[in-house]
């Protein structure tokens, strides 16, 4: 099984899904980033740097791999 980084659009969709009913302001403040940065990540116009990925993963209590990486099965 190969692990690949998801494209920015899929990462954005996953971040929106994780945020649920919380506001962007609430999540951004908790993570320590600007609301505009979180908005760009959620829209898929930017991918967070590794240190921000760690903060996001910690905040949502989700493994980095489940947020930012897709697993691709190879047929044999």
Outline where the language-model segments fall:
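Active-site phosphate/pyrophosphate- and oxyanion-stabilizing loops and adjacent acidic/basic residues
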Residues: 16, 25, 54
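A short, Lys/Arg-rich alpha-helix, primarily the initiator
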Residues: 1-21
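Short coil turns linking two alpha-helices in DNA-binding domains
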Residues: 34-37, 49, 63
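Short amphipathic recognition helices of helix-turn-helix/homeodomain-type DNA-binding modules
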Residues: 66-76
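Short alpha-helical DNA-recognition segment
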Residues: 21-40
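Residue-level detection of the helix-turn-helix DNA-binding "recognition helix"
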Residues: 32, 43-45, 72
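DNA-binding alpha-helical recognition surfaces that contact promoter or target DNA
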Residues: 13, 17, 40, 58, ...
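DNA major-groove recognition helix of helix-turn-helix/homeodomain DNA-binding modules
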Residues: 51-66
